[in-house]
Structure formats: C-alpha cells, structure tokens
Amino acid sequence: MDTVVKHELASSAYNRRRESCENACAHIAAKHPEVKYLSDATMTMLNEVDVEIPAEDYMRAEYVIGEKQRVLDVCDALEKGDYETVGDRMYGTHYGMSKLYEVSCEELDFLNDLAKACGVTGSRVMGGGFGGCTINLVKEALYDSFIKTAKEKFNARFGHEPKVYDVVISDGARKIE
C-alpha cells in the first residue's frame, strides 16, 4: 500500500544513521576485533558497549543487528512454508524501522497498525522509509475486507486513499543448485 507520502530522503538523515551504526561498530570492534561490520556483531556485543555510546546509536545498531536475524528467520520460514513466522518478522522489522531506526512516518505506522488490527499476517515498511509504501502479507480470505477497511480508514485520517498494488507470491527468485 502506497501512502502517497513522497520520500524526502534527506541525505543528512541517512548519514546520521550510518554514523550512528559506524560509531556503535567501532566501540564493539574495540572489544571484539573480529567485528569489521555491524552485521558481524551480536546483541550481546552491543550490550557490552551500551553505556559507552549515545542511546540513539544503540537503538540504530539494535535495529541493524536484529534485522539481520529477522532476515535469516524469514529465509528459514519461507523454506518451511511458515508464513506466520514470516509475518511476525515483518511486523518486527516495521517496529524496528519505526521506533529504533526512526525512518517511518505517521502514515506508514497507521497502515501497519491497521494491518495488525485487521488480522493481516504481516506488514512492514517497504524500502527506505520516510514515506512510501508498506508491503502486507494478507490471507486471501481477508484481502477484500482489509483493502476496503484500509482505504476507508486511511482516507478518513489523511484525506486520501492509499494506492494499492496487488502482488502474488510466486516461484520467482530461488536458489539454483
């Protein structure tokens, strides 16, 4: 669902997030030289430096480290056809992008909260945030009622309907052996 909020991706906003993550990584690497990138770190390592770095840097690093695990969880869940876990991790990603990495906006959070309230399996920010779209994992039986409700409630709150782009899971990209 497209909020129709234009991405105002101020490079300075992304630069601040990158700097936060680099700072957290540098503090972790000082104690764990094997850590070259934040993706090499664990939450245990991050917790070891929590008093050494600003709270904002901690939150942003927490999102990045958590997101790495969520991606791995989703890969495993997809191989097993476990869409409930996929959906749970999607909601976790949205929470992290909104509350920890701070790249969501009111409209995206509204659609995510509405999806959860409507029983949608999963929902998250799509792309870089600061506006744009959510992607939603919706069971076929809920699809029509969710779209109708989302359009009505979003319009009542923001004065316009979100755009809806239908996609269907397919055998698209896959591992070749």
Could you tell me what each predicted segment is?
Residues G131-L137:
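Short beta-strand->loop micro-motif that forms the acidic, two-metal-ion catalytic signature
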Residues D2-G122, L137-E177:
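C-terminal nucleotide
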